[in-house]
From Swiss-Prot:
Intrachain S-S bonds: 52-58, 53-61
Family according to the record: Belongs to the conotoxin A superfamily.
Example GO molecular function: acetylcholine receptor inhibitor activity
Cellular component terms (Gene Ontology): extracellular region; host cell postsynaptic membrane
InterPro entries in the cross-refs: T-conotoxin
Protein's organism: Conus textile (Cloth-of-gold cone)
Key words of the record: Acetylcholine receptor inhibiting toxin, Amidation, Disulfide bond, Hydroxylation, Neurotoxin, Postsynaptic neurotoxin, Secreted, Signal, Toxin
Cleaved signal peptide residues: 1-22
Name of this chain's protein: Conotoxin TxIC
Main location: secreted
């Protein structure tokens, strides 16, 4: 019973928190999604057999 008031207060605080829909941005106001897209395309390029044949982090050529 001692935890019930604390639980109610925490529930009210989390309900009034910021929305999850907010888009993450850097300090320069560039969306972080563009950085994620760049990282994904770089990884895709590195995993291409023709571009990374012989590197340890890539799939061996075959």
């Amino acid at each position: 019973m001692h935890c019930l008031p604390i639980f109610v207060i925490l529930l009210l605080l989390t309900a009034s928190g910021p929305s999850v829909d907010a888009q993450l941005k850097t300090k320069d106001d560039v969306p972080l999604s563009s950085f994620r897209d760049h990282a994904k395309s770089t990884l895709r390029r590195l995993q291409d057999k023709q571009t990374c044949c012989g590197y340890r982090m890539c799939v061996p050529c075959g």
